């Protein structure tokens, strides 16, 4: 009962900020809705700021696409509730990075936001969410990619492996926090991944065949 009350309080706060646009998740009571103030969001983004609003907007975009994949492909047996939570948390580390164009005023390179978020989630005892955070850059990075490109990341394979990790990574690629109003097509998204090499584009197109 205490937990349920806490969720309703969080929902009321969100209503005051977003008005009629708001939606919340109080699974299993509102299983088809998404946005609610997850305890980790309240902990790391306690105030209503442009960054928190952008994070929630982007998270909802990613969640909606991921849940559409769940609906289209019940044969995949995807964990719907986990995907919803993963979409909310996957970018939680962005506040630690230096990307003022999207309201991030930390000190680390933006490329590290995944591993930064993973570190936070491991401190919270959530290895499943840590993996989501660190494995959604591009279509995933290998230790060789990181070493050859001199990326500011640990030299280890950071590849989405479970179906949920792959769906989250795929859904995320259609949206950019620097242009939050846009939704890329499959073709535009494939083009945007060319910076990660031909293998990344190939993997994305394989996902498109599986998930669309």
How should these model regions be labeled?
Residues 10, 15, 22-24:
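Cysteine-centered motifs
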Residues 75-186:
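Divalent metal-dependent catalytic cores for phosphoryl transfer on phosphate-bearing substrates
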Residues 195-212:
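Charged phosphate-binding loop/patch that engages nucleotide di/tri-phosphates or the phosphate backbone
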Residues 20, 27-28:
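Intrinsically disordered, low-complexity segments enriched in serine/proline and basic residues
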Residues 30-110:
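Acidic/His-rich, divalent-metal-binding segments that scaffold phosphate/diphosphate chemistry
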Residues 4-5, 26, 35:
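Leucine-biased recognition of intrinsically disordered, low-complexity hydrophobic segments
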Residues 1-10:
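Extreme N-terminal basic, low-complexity initiation segments
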């Amino acid at each position: 009962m205490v937990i349920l009350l806490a969720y309703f309080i969080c929902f009321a706060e969100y209503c005051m900020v977003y008005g009629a646009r708001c939606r919340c998740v109080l699974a299993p009571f509102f299983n088809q809705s998404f946005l609610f103030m997850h305890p980790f969001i309240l902990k790391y983004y306690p105030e209503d700021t442009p960054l928190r609003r952008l994070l929630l907007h982007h998270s909802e975009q990613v969640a909606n696409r991921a849940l559409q994949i769940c609906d289209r492909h019940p044969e995949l047996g995807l964990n719907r509730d986990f995907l919803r939570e993963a979409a909310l948390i996957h970018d939680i580390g962005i506040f630690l990075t230096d990307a003022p164009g999207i309201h991030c005023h930390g000190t680390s390179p933006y490329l590290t936001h995944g591993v930064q978020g993973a570190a936070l989630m491991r401190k919270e005892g959530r290895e499943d969410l840590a993996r989501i955070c660190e494995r959604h850059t591009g279509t995933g990075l290998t230790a060789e990619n990181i070493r050859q490109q001199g990326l500011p990341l640990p030299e280890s394979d950071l590849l989405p492996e479970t179906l949920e990790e792959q769906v989250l990574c795929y859904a995320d690629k259609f949206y950019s926090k620097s242009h939050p109003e846009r939704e890329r097509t499959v073709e535009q998204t494939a083009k945007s991944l060319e910076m990660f090499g031909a293998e990344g584009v190939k993997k994305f197109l394989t996902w498109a065949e599986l998930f669309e």
